[in-house]
Amino acid sequence: MSHLLEVKNLDVKFDTDEGRITAVENISLSVDQGEVLGIVGESGSGKSVTAKSIMKLNPGNTSYNEDAEIILDNENVLQFTSKQDLKKIRGGKVSMIFQEPMASFAPAIKIGAQMVEQLLIHKNINKDEAKSISINMLKRVGIADAEKRFNQYAFELSGGMRQRAMIAMALSTMPKLLLADEPTTALDVTIQAQVINLIKDIIKEYQMGVIFITHDLGVIAQVADHVAVMYLGSVVEKGPVNEILKNPKHPYTKGLLQALPDINNLDA
């Protein structure tokens, strides 16, 4: 059976005034329907560049190697050149949750209007149906007074509520693949736990594939089935999450594990 997503031999380079810089090199990974792949690594390791490549969201100075493939739903995304092809996947087949929701919402447009616009682009429905789906999804992610929030701007919501609204927007089109880029980093511990549980519930309910990006192996342990550890633009270790956590092979993975707090020895 083919994977929902398969990335093969991906190199991503950026052309700069100082020359061509390699951001990620020889990345190969896969995600199946209903599976969560965690990608973990420090800032600058290439996690987000890899994820954005799946939607071709990297900037205009980006180049990909000719033998690379990003096979999504049996199509090679790297061969997409028209806006129409890319529109099919951006917010349709693939949705992305970003670390900072204020960067995702247009500040001068109400949240509901943005959700409705996205649904009208990707679904064969009318405006009233799109509004109903949007409000129901806001309720689904635990936002009280969803009808009221639908008519508010992003800056009027708390940080945790904005994050939930962004998750609702990402999920409203029922994507096959969800890219979650550090979705809990900016939240306090209580809200972080709620958002993680919400994402887990929705994955189970809708059976979508997920790439969950973070610098925190503790979060990966809670949500992921498999994990890929990235360091300096390369995947240095990957496998089932329990196997990697119990028996890490690479020194960098061991270092990440050693940095986790020992809940059994908090007074040490």
Predicted regions mapped to residue ranges:
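Short, glycine/charged-rich "phosphate-handling" switch motifs in NTP-dependent
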Residues: 226, 238
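Short catalytic/signature loops enriched in Gly
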Residues: 3, 144-148, 239-268
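A short, surface-exposed alpha-helical micro-motif characterized by mixed small hydrophobic
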Residues: 220-222
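A short, flexible loop at the N-terminus of ABC-type nucleotide-binding domains that lies
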Residues: 4, 13-26, 57-63, 81-84, ...
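A short, proline-enriched helix->beta-strand linker immediately N-terminal to the Walker B motif
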Residues: 172-176
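ABC ATPase NBD Q-loop/coupling interface
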Residues: 15, 69-88, 126, 197, ...
